[in-house]
UniProtKB/Swiss-Prot annotation:
Transmembrane segments: none annotated. Keywords: Ribonucleoprotein, Ribosomal protein, RNA-binding, rRNA-binding. Gene3D superfamilies: 3.40.1370.10. Part of the 50S ribosomal subunit. InterPro entries: Ribosomal_uL4, Ribosomal_uL4-like, Ribosomal_uL4_dom_sf. Residues 43-67 are annotated as: Disordered. This is Large ribosomal subunit protein uL4. Pfam families: Ribosomal_L4. One of the primary rRNA binding proteins, this protein initially binds near the 5'-end of the 23S rRNA. It is important during the early stages of 50S assembly. It makes multiple contacts with different domains of the 23S rRNA in the assembled 50S subunit and ribosome. The lineage of its organism: Bacteria, Pseudomonadati, Pseudomonadota, Gammaproteobacteria, Lysobacterales. One of its GO terms (biological process) is translation. Belongs to the universal ribosomal protein uL4 family. GO terms for cellular component: ribonucleoprotein complex; ribosome.
Length: 200
């Protein structure tokens, strides 16, 4: 049972989702895989065989000085790169069971550390950043709060858009990086039920 902030009501939560043992290795693997999936992997450099330039020997072999060949060698300015980077995929395989287990572990650890705050509802009547700031001040959520609602709220999303450290997600848009990086996760009671349906 978790207490709903701002009232005496309690919400029953699943131990499998909010009381799971924390596995740092699992969470690290899933977070790294998630971040790597967002990498373009388009970095490219040219080797000595790919750069434009003549392959003619730059100077005579004899006569003193170093014994250079083509000016496309990596030692020269404008030459190729010794171990040239090539486009590649950084994708790591993480199956669904691992991903969900990591999300459960993160929620459980947030709960144990007192960084998980459940509220009855979290919405704004109009798109006003000032109203959102006042609401967050009343909750004491730290510098980097993550607000999780059952469904996307346009007023809430637009109000938080120009607050650089405030994130707003619906349950469907949750990801491990957002959860790990938040000082406090503010989640509505309806969103808790939806999270349990997803992860249990």
């Amino acid at each position: 049972m978790l207490v709903i902030t701002g009232s005496n009501n309690k919400v029953s939560v699943s131990e499998a989702v909010f009381g799971r043992e924390f596995s740092e290795d699992l969470v690290h693997q899933v977070v790294v895989a998630y971040r790597n999936a967002g990498r373009a992997g388009t970095k490219a450099q040219k080797t000595r065989s790919e750069v434009a330039g003549t392959t003619k020997k730059s100077k005579k072999q004899k006569g003193g000085g170093a014994r250079h060949g083509a000016l496309t060698a990596p030692i020269f300015v404008g030459g190729g790169v010794t171990f040239a980077a090539k486009p590649r995929s950084f994708e790591q395989k993480v199956n669904r069971k691992m991903y969900r287990a990591a999300i459960c572990a993160i929620f459980s650890e947030l709960n144990r550390q007192g960084r998980l705050m459940i509220v009855d509802a979290f919405d704004l009547e109009a798109t006003k950043t000032k109203d959102l700031i006042e609401k967050l001040k009343g909750l004491d959520v730290g510098k980097r709060p993550l607000i999780v609602t059952e469904e996307a709220s346009e007023h809430l999303y637009l109000s938080a858009r120009n607050l650089p450290y405030v994130q707003v997600r619906d349950v469907q848009g949750l990801d491990p990086v957002a959860l790990v990086g938040a000082d406090t996760v503010v989640i509505t009671a309806d969103a808790v039920k939806k999270v349990e349906e997803w992860l249990a």
